[in-house]
Amino acid sequence: MTLGLMAQTQHMKFMGIPLNGTISTFQQKLVAKGCKHDVKRSKAVGVGCRTFTGTFFGEEAIIFVYYNAKTKVVYRAKACIERNSEDDIIRKYDEVKSALEEKYPDANIAKGECDGYESIGFYTVQGAIGLYVTRSDNYSYDYALHIDYSDDANDKKNENSKMNDL
């Protein structure tokens, strides 16, 4: 008898949760970590994204979880930390950047710019993490730090699903 071994896809993790499975399962895991579903904001962003409030990297954050509207499979999650001070947001950016560099020492790194601030992307076999700052005059805060995780395998499946509609 021949035994075959199947390679199992490793998925990018957000808050220790693999970016895989259905939005319902992912939501249960976030809630178990103390996050709260923000129903009002979720309705505003529409199908394909659910929002939560919770703690990320020791800070109050708004969490966005993106999923394929047809399959309900999660492929991306993002935490946004808000600040009213430019100095505060830059300090937090530097702190998170250092932590990501430590956690992902073998990642390919790409630097860029967003809203006049440095941005950085960490690329691994499992996916990518984008770190960037945005400015806003339309919200109750002036600056937001985005920590944006994307799972490579499920992001590709999501894109293929959309392309099948064409």
Language model segments and positions:
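Non-cytosolic coordination micro-motifs
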Residues: 8-47, 78-166
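Bacterial Sec-dependent N-terminal signal peptides
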Residues: 1-8
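Mid-chain, structured segments of secreted extracytoplasmic proteins
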Residues: 49-94
